[in-house]
Amino acid sequence: MLSLTPVLTVSYEAKISFLFLSAMEFAVGILANAFIVLVNVWDVVKKQPLNNCDIALLCLSITRLFLQGLLLLDAIQLACFQQMKDPLSHNYQAILTLWMIANQVSLWLAACLSLLYCSKIVRFSHTFPLHVASWVSRRFLQMLLVVLLLSCICTALCLWDFFCRSHSTVTSLLHLNSTEFSLQIAKLNFFYSFIFCNVGSVPPSLAFLVSSGVLVISLGSHMRTMKSQTSSSGDPSLEAHIRAIIFLISFFCFYVVSFCAALISIPLLMLWHNKGGVMICIGMMAACPSGHAAILISGNAKLRRAIETMLFWFQSRQKVRPVHKVPPRTL
């Protein structure tokens, strides 16, 4: 007969600290991603055309806003409502499923950005890569629409799988009297849903890794050319290579950390019932979107100019603010 794993609870102070940290990560992520969205939306309001990179960043930041909200809900659910004797409640499974979908959409958009950087920066010498790079540059908006359509299809499939497995789990619970066996069925169903939802991440992961690898190889070739020609260090092509690679490597690192934290949280939740370990994993997952948004802002000239304009406006408002002096009394 199966035996239940001992439940590892956390103290009230740990829950309060976790909620405070989650709220701080949520605030930073919302501010950073909302700033990217507002800057680009303001350009649209002023009827200034957005380039392909701005459109992709706008879509990515909107996805990140949704992602940050889900992670905050996940933290509140875990700290306040989650009973570790029943770790796979329907609400918790729904939040994690939506997080997997939003994370997959952000990966698709990052793959599109990686392909765009590759087509704009890398100087190809063969015919086929030249045609592919030209097609990506000319048809980027159509490619983005196809990616969003594929994301919608993956979302529908993941939600269909989630609701079907939830229905089968409820049905098995009604027909079985063994609580332990019912928990095992719920764990298996959620594990299969996790695998099914992440299968759609394979194509964008491959596209992201291939285009990023091409950029790294191109950077190495460009640096060797610069050394042989003794070029100056202010080469714009070199700077474009470095900015693109910083964006891609940072996204890849944050994505791997987030995915590994989500992967580790599953056995912590289902097998060991360790709420403290799951809290650490969720804190790491919530830090990734906000951290990458900060890197995006620091590496984008348009967003940096917007921050400088805002700071200048605040400083000028402080200087212009009149000082009210009390008039002297007359006898």
UniProtKB/Swiss-Prot annotation:
Sugar-modified residues: 177
Similarity remark: Belongs to the G-protein coupled receptor T2R family.
Any Pfam family hit: TAS2R
Cytoplasmic side: 39-55, 116-142, 211-243, 298-331
PANTHER family in UniProt: TASTE RECEPTOR TYPE 2 (PTHR11394), TASTE RECEPTOR TYPE 2 MEMBER 38 (PTHR11394:SF52)
Presence of keyword Glycoprotein: yes
Tissues expressed in: Low levels in tongue, stomach and duodenum.
Topology versus the membrane: Multi-pass membrane protein
Native source species: Mus musculus
Stretches of the chain found on the membrane's Extracellular side: 1-17, 77-94, 164-189, 265-276
Protein name from the UniProt record: Taste receptor type 2 member 38
Domain of life per record: Eukaryota
GO biological process terms on file: detection of chemical stimulus involved in sensory perception of bitter taste
Chain ranges passing through the membrane: 18-38, 56-76, 95-115, 143-163, 190-210, 244-264, 277-297
Gene that specifies this protein: Tas2r38
Annotated function: Putative taste receptor which may play a role in the perception of bitterness.
SUPFAM superfamilies recorded: Family A G protein-coupled receptor-like
Chief location: membrane
